[in-house]
Design a protein with these regions (language model features):
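ATP-binding N-terminal substructure of ATP-dependent carboxylate-amine bond-forming enzymes
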Residues: 1-81, 86-90, 94, 117-120
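Active-site nucleotide/adenylate-binding loops and adjacent lid/helix of ATP-dependent enzymes
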Residues: 2-9, 15, 71-76, 85-184, ...
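Short, solvent-exposed loop/turn segments at secondary-structure junctions
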Residues: 12, 59, 141-142, 179-180, ...
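Short, solvent-exposed loop/turn elements at beta->coil junctions and helix N-caps
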Residues: 40-42, 175-180, 280-283
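Structured loop/turn residues at beta-strand edges in well-structured enzyme cores
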Residues: 47, 104, 129-130, 275, ...
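A short beta-strand motif that forms the metal-chelation/ATP-contact edge
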Residues: 49-54, 187-191, 288-301
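Phosphate-binding site of ATP-dependent enzymes
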Residues: 151-266, 270, 291
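ATP-dependent carboxylate activation and anion-phosphoryl transfer catalytic cores
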Residues: 255-327
Length: 327
């Protein structure tokens, strides 16, 4: 019997996910039936799939409660990857505090919650900021929407942005802008479930057969700087006025040993199991040491086009997982 796989997207992302076609082709070549389904389509019978794979559900941050309710419901009807517990944990960037407490080198992160005094919170952060620029972003967000960088002297513009987010009921994440990214870019390391890779030492990620027990490193890419130059005092925060995602400049990259080590520590600190895929986004600090910027476990782009065979490798992991649940 052919496994039936859903690649889960969003209506707004149709035609935008460059990973979708190669992954669907790889799954079909490996003997699966594949359907592309919008997560919020009421006409989809999720119980008809052996596995639903989250891919380009890029509008979730605007509808988080609705999306998480859907995740819970669908996880009772079929195998959802990544699992519901992982998605709940990963869709709010407060997880960065948990990883930092676990000893993972992480970009310094300060959160302001709705109801907080925006000016007091921002000024407290600026008083401790050593870098000349900062980044302000929503704690729940995707595609760099509503994310801007500011010079520390552009306090008024940063404060207007922070206030707009807080007034909309959104938690705010403040971080230093690490200028090394302008030259070196980000390093995105992609991991798939599969056979143990002794070069990374990543912990087991799921119960089950050998092919499901471990996340292993597959490939890496360089992501060019995503944020434009710092905004000035007269900038309109434009919260809510943005495209689905910010375009990225992607090129292949060879992951360095120190980057693999930090990625392994980040993955080992995840408090949930059952992952099929993960993307670890790192940048380098002023001392040229890699630090975690984000851990993408929900709907990351996996950049198959920059690593021949990577779609097929994830496809095999998907089918291994699906077949393990087929009676």
């Amino acid at each position: 019997m052919k496994p039936v796989i859903a690649l889960v997207t969003a209506r707004a992302a149709r035609g935008l996910d460059e990973d979708e076609a190669p992954l669907a082709a790889a799954l079909r070549a490996a003997g699966a039936e594949v359907a592309i389904a919008d997560w919020d389509d009421p006409g989809v019978s999720w119980e008809s799939f052996d596995l639903a794979l989250l891919r380009s559900t890029w509008d979730y941050s605007e509808r988080l409660s609705e999306f998480l309710a859907w995740v819970e419901r669908v996880s009772r009807l079929t195998t959802l990857s990544n699992p519901a517990a992982v998605v709940r944990w990963n869709t709010d960037k407060h997880y960065l505090l948990e990883l930092a407490r676990a000893g993972v080198p992480t970009v310094c992160s300060r959160f302001l919650e709705p109801g907080a005094d925006a000016a007091v919170g921002l000024d407290s952060f600026l008083a401790q900021l050593e870098e000349p620029e900062l980044v302000a972003k929503p704690a729940v967000g995707a595609g760099s929407r509503d994310t801007h960088r500011y010079r520390r002297q552009s306090r008024a513009a940063a404060l207007a942005h922070v206030r707009q987010l807080l007034d909309a009921g959104r938690s705010v994440l403040l971080q230093p802008y690490l200028g090394r990214v302008d030259e070196y870019g980000e390093t995105a390391l992609i991991f798939f479930a599969g056979v143990f890779d002794p070069t990374t030492g990543v912990k087991p990620g799921a119960r089950g057969g050998a092919s499901m027990d471990v996340l292993h490193f597959d490939h890496a890419v360089r992501k060019g700087p995503m944020l434009p130059g710092p905004r000035d005092e007269h900038a309109n925060p434009e919260v809510g006025a943005r495209p689905l995602f910010v375009a990225e400049h992607i090129t292949p990259r060879t992951a360095q040993p120190d980057e693999l080590e930090v990625a392994a520590r980040a993955l080992a600190a995840i408090p949930h199991e059952g992952l099929l895929y993960a993307r670890v986004d790192l940048i380098r600090d002023a001392a040229d040491a890699p630090v975690l910027l984000e851990l993408e476990l929900t709907e990351p782009s996996l950049f198959f086009g920059h690593s021949p065979g990577s779609a097929a490798r994830l496809g095999r992991a998907v089918l291994d997982r699906a077949r393990s649940f087929i009676l």
